[in-house]
């Protein structure tokens, strides 16, 4: 059976009367291009109440629009010679300093320009297969807009041992972020369960419904306060999707530039950087740690805030 991804989006009162194609572009612009969405509609892969719809059909509040997208086959994922910032590499793994704007692995509607495409060119076939054809070598992810360190497994044994540490929460992951507002306390722990947003499946939200949510723990430490922003160090106790971004917004200090959970603030991406990663090496069985400094855009923002 063909593997598929299905996106189910609720139509709200604010969407009343919008054309199906325009509605989908608004809701899925971060994931798919306009041309790709229009092709899905033409191919009868956009449904309302189980019936295919046309571009100019109007949506109604209370309806659910379903978008059905075939997952990429192995042949769809090509090796691409994309420059990589490799911090460390051996026979078991490599540490990549991912640039902001790079997607980690191919997904529906986005098959090229990803970290996986670059890894296929760099490592040839020396990547773990546990993640499947779409995610070879990928042990954990970073959001598209997040820069920083990410570990990649080059064989299945390394993948299992590394993934086990992430699951057991023994791997060390530290982020640095510039958040909006002056954080009151020097240190804090945010314990708030997360689940898919009930109205927007692309987003996560704090949700105390035990049937839907998963526990999430984030610890933060203030590094420097500015007039209207704060530089914080954030350590993950769990590794949920969008965890840092949702938790910081939840306590009133959204990551600057995060248009999904805060405001754009005149920035091109969320000011969030995966600064440190540490784990037990699968072969040496010794703890190793890698650190990277924030990229230029974050450094420039920090210097700008210092001058205010």
Feature-to-residue mapping (PLM):
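RNA pseudouridine synthases
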Residues: 1-189, 193, 198, 271, ...
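Flexible glycine-rich active-site/ligand-binding loops centered on an Asp-His dyad
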Residues: 112, 172, 176, 180, ...
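Conserved "cap/hinge" positions at secondary-structure junctions
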Residues: 50, 69, 246, 259, ...
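The conserved catalytic core of RNA pseudouridine synthases
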Residues: 132-164, 171-172, 195-251, 274-308
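Conserved hydrophobic positions within beta-strands
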Residues: 86, 179, 220-222, 255
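Short alpha-helix capping/helix-loop boundary micro-motifs
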Residues: 49-55, 228-231, 263
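RNA substrate-recognition surfaces in RNA-acting enzymes
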Residues: 255-283
């Amino acid at each position: 059976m063909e593997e598929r991804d299905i996106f189910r989006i609720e139509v709200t009162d604010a969407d009343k009367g919008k054309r199906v194609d325009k509605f989908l572009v608004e809701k899925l612009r971060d994931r798919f291009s306009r041309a790709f969405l229009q092709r899905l509609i033409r191919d009868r892969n956009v449904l309302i109440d189980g019936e295919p719809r046309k571009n100019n059909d109007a949506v109604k509040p209370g309806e659910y629009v379903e978008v059905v997208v075939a997952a990429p086959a192995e042949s769809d994922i090509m090796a691409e010679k994309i420059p990589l910032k490799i911090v460390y590499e051996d026979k078991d793994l490599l540490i990549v300093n991912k640039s902001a704007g790079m997607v980690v692995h191919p997904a529906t509607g986005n098959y090229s320009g990803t970290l996986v495409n670059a890894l296929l060119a760099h490592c040839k076939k020396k990547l773990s297969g546990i993640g499947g054809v779409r995610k070879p070598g990928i042990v954990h992810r970073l959001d598209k807009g997040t820069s920083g360190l990410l570990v990649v497994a080059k064989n299945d044994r390394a993948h299992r041992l590394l993934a086990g540490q992430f699951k057991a929460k023994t791997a060390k992951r530290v982020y640095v972020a510039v958040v909006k507002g002056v954080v009151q306390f020097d240190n804090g722990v945010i314990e708030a369960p997360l689940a898919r947003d009930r109205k927007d499946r692309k987003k996560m939200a704090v949700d105390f419904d035990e049937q839907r949510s998963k526990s999430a723990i984030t610890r933060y430490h203030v590094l420097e306060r500015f007039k209207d922003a704060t530089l914080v160090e954030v350590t993950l106790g769990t590794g949920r999707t969008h965890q840092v971004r949702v938790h910081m917004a939840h306590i009133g200090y959204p990551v600057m530039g995060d248009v999904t959970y805060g405001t754009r603030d005149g920035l091109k991406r969320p000011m969030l950087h995966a600064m440190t990663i540490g784990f037990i090496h699968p072969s040496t069985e010794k703890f190793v740690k890698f650190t990277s400094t924030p990229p230029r855009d974050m450094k420039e923002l920090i210097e700008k805030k210092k001058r205010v």
